[in-house]
Amino acid sequence: MAHSYLLEVGLEEMPAHVVTPSIQQLKTRVANYLTEERIDFEDIQAYSTPRRLALLISGLADKQPDVDESVKGPAKKIAQDADGNWTKAAIGFTRGQGATVDDIEFKEVKGVEYVYVEKHIQGKPVAEVLAGLNDVITAMNFPTLMRWGSFKLNFIRPIHWLVSLLDDQVVPFDILNVTAGRLTRGHRFLGHDVEIKSATDYVAALKDDFVIVDAAERKATIKDQIQAIVDQHNWVIDWDEELLEEVNNLVEWPTAFAGTFDQKYLELPEPVLITSMKDNQRFFCVRDHDGKLQPAFISVRNGNAVHLDNVIKGNERVLVPRLEDAKFFFDEDQKMTIDQYVDRLKNVSFHDQISSMYDKMARTKALANLLGQQLGLSDQELADLARAASIYKFDLTTQMVGEFAELQGIMGEIYAKRFGENEAVAAAVREHYMPISADGALPQTTVGTVLAIADKLDSIYSFFAVDMIPSGSNDPYALRRQAYGIVRMLADRKWHLNLLDFQASAKQAVEQATPALGLDYAKNADAVTDFFIDRLKQLFSLDHLRHDIVDAVTDTHVTDPAAIVEAAHVLDAHKDDADLKDQVEALTRVIRLAAKGNLSEDDVKVDPSLFENPSEGQLDQAVQALIDAKEGRSLDQQFSALLELEPVISLYFEENMIMDKDEAVKNNRLSLLTILADQTAAFGNLDQLIVK
């Protein structure tokens, strides 16, 4: 008979951001526990609110299946003495297995006889297994923990009640001073204690007591209510899924409502208004059909519609001081100049072991100029880049960013425009933070992209210079995210930058621009290169590239991220070519022999007069044609051209002994192979490819 089981953990209200990951964790842990305990089940439905984590398991088996197990004991020579009597080792072994020496049989393993006992293990009833869920619950981990009373358990919030029902029967267990039963609690203010008669009654019973336990249903209810208000007022709403998720995990019985604020606050920049309402009050902003922000908001109450007018007035009243503060900061910030804000950065620390934020900008400016010149920016772009790099952190010392840190960069762009900076400079001030997450949007402007790369490179070089290198999961300054952002930007723009060479050049440029800072930019250069290679591997992993392709393109002296990314995609595009095995094997044979020859650059010379077979001339002509056509070809076309050399290469190896006794002939042949091997370098170490 299949059973249903309800588990509910009732808690003090949890922070909204931990509700969803917590219920996912509980579901995974319980599923793993049942699997480990050999209890079959069909499905687990997860439910969550700010005050509860619950699972409804369907199709549970009656019991564990019985198990017949053959248990290995000591060797026969240890189990019996010379007269064939059972030793203490044999007697102790059988006693431990709930058997007697009469149950012993011998089995040979690798030429040695061992004692074995056959055991029949009776499966435990499902209720007995479920009673062990207390350990599953208390083993959960959370980003923040707390204790309560005199108890030593660390948990996300105090546990107030537990429900454990197998069909209509309680499966009791204890966590601290709380015993699992059938009593749950409804809405904190609207509900009461609720007795659950049977596991499958759970959702309906709580809905009758003002709790929607199904998070998906609750979210849909919120969206429907908000959309109804939007339609009623002929508004438009930009759905903010992050805010919707947060609000959903703040309420158990949602009731949406609309409020208004004074029209005068619309004079504030939109990001300021939106931040004041969204981040501080969890309000949804609304617009008209022309996209203009309206002096109104939508919020969601954790309760019903009783006295909703008072709730609306209260929310409107709370919003006003927020908007007044924002208006004050905005007005006051415009009474100073950008240069005055920049000067204040001398007293803002980037890191106490590195420099002030002012000095960081000076380093970044030198880096940005060097980078801009290498990437071929126009004179106007270089001028805009220089100006942007001179001011791009200025908004950190404004009152608005001091109050709303999440607006850094955004307010920088707004203020820069108001202070007369051109569009390119203002946009770069905002874009230098991008991407703000691993999959975040990239800068859209050339100047902004160069500044973003330069700023992040400075952070990485600076922290590596003072030996503050990320290790394990420890990365307090988000250097991995910044390096990953650099890789993404370079690959997206197809900007070729040799990171190892650039770091050496950056050291010289920064030391000339800021000689007093004393940072050795070139310190730990190999570690910096490896750091970026690891970020490339991360990128390739997310692109689901084969491991051998990743190994091939990263096992190389090439430190140009854009080139490595392009090479990886070229190899991936050809991985299923019909003739790839023969083609790659021919090229890898060339590479290995060239490496074995180990000729110096000066010794690599091909003399046609030393050719002894037609195939040598054919390969020489083919390689030269390959090199001559290289400039006008894409990387994919270059790789295809290399693969097409396979017949010529194979004939060459058939007709010629590379390691000829004649030193001149040998070196001539090795020179030709070395030149060809050099043409494969752009694709990494082809020897790493697995071809079938």
From Swiss-Prot:
The UniProt record lists the keyword Glycoprotein: no
GO biological process: glycyl-tRNA aminoacylation
Matching PROSITE patterns: AA_TRNA_LIGASE_II_GLYAB (PS50861)
One GO term describing the cellular component: cytosol
Catalytic activity: tRNA(Gly) + glycine + ATP = glycyl-tRNA(Gly) + AMP + diphosphate
Compartments where located: Cytoplasm
GO MF, any single term: glycine-tRNA ligase activity
EC number(s) on file: 6.1.1.14
Protein's UniProt keywords contain Signal: no
Entries under InterPro entries matching the protein: Gly-tRNA-synth_bsu, Gly-tRNA-synth_heterodimer
Enzyme class name: ligase
Keyword annotations of the record: Aminoacyl-tRNA synthetase, ATP-binding, Cytoplasm, Ligase, Nucleotide-binding, Protein biosynthesis
Main location: cytoplasm
Domain of life: Bacteria
Family to which this protein belongs: Belongs to the class-II aminoacyl-tRNA synthetase family.
Subunit structure: Tetramer of two alpha and two beta subunits.
Protein name, per record: Glycine--tRNA ligase beta subunit
Taxonomic lineage from the root: Bacteria, Bacillati, Bacillota, Bacilli, Lactobacillales
